[in-house]
A protein has these predicted regions:
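Adenosyl-5′-phosphate
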Residues: 2-232
């Protein structure tokens, strides 16, 4: 948190959204690839959106970034894919354009009063029991940390750690092996990073090497869910 406060608003917000910082990414890449991308800064996408917002305050600019990146390219995409996979047309009523316009007109001080979703919590007072109205936000996170010790363990070892793994041309194998061992032993949790490596390997096989044997990017998750259900 202090590290994010030491930089400009856009950079700080971008760092707070990231699951890996630039130093960790560079450590994970092979020296050759790290040199190639040395001048690339992924946070430029955050800065561009932040600067596009004409609101004068930091909070509104951060919310604009969240709508453009975290919402549009993240949560909504995943929910839509998951819904359509089961024949469901998912709707997001609180993203109705009139509701969004109203939300943007709410003064910043009121948006932040009372903690997260303060205004919404006040609206439902008396309509929901107190424990529901005041509880912490709960999302639908994928249990990657557990999966890589269970149903995704073999896949990672066979595809990412294999001597002939395509992803080896991108990454430092020693660093990858270290974080894998840290994860398995419980010293640290690296679920999101390990998943990125699985996806990088699949992407490389599909788009750079034209491998017809490559499964779709969602196959690992589907297989993990299937195996997890079998275990349960």
């Amino acid at each position: 948190t202090l590290r994010n406060l030491a930089v400009d608003g856009a950079t700080g917000h971008g760092q707070s959204m990231s699951t890996m910082d630039a130093e960790d990414v560079c450590d994970l890449l092979s020296p050759e690839v790290a040199r190639e991308v040395d001048e690339y800064d992924a946070l430029d996408h955050v800065r561009n959106l932040y600067d596009r917002c004409d609101a004068p305050d930091h909070v509104s600019k951060c919310q604009f970034v969240d709508m453009g990146l975290g919402l549009a390219d993240g949560i909504l995409t995943k929910v839509d894919r998951a819904g359509m996979a089961h024949g469901l047309e998912v709707r997001s009523p609180m993203l109705d354009y009139e509701w969004v316009q109203l939300a943007w007109r709410v003064p910043v001080a009121m948006r932040m009063t009372g903690g997260g979703k303060g205004g919404l919590r006040r609206i439902v007072e008396g309509k929901l029991n107190k424990s529901t109205a005041t509880r912490r936000k709960t999302g639908f996170e994928v249990p990657l940390n557990e999966w890589f010790k269970g149903p995704l363990r073999d896949r990672f070892q066979e595809e990412v750690l294999a001597p002939n793994a395509i992803v080896r041309e991108w990454i430092d194998h020693d660093v990858t092996r270290r974080i894998w061992n840290e994860h398995l032993t419980g010293r640290k949790t690296h679920g999101p990073t390990l998943w990125k490596l699985v996806m990088l390997n699949s992407w490389s096989r599909m788009y750079l090497h034209g491998s017809e044997a490559c499964a779709s990017p969602d196959t690992a998750a589907h297989q993990a869910v299937h195996n997890a259900k079998g275990i349960a």
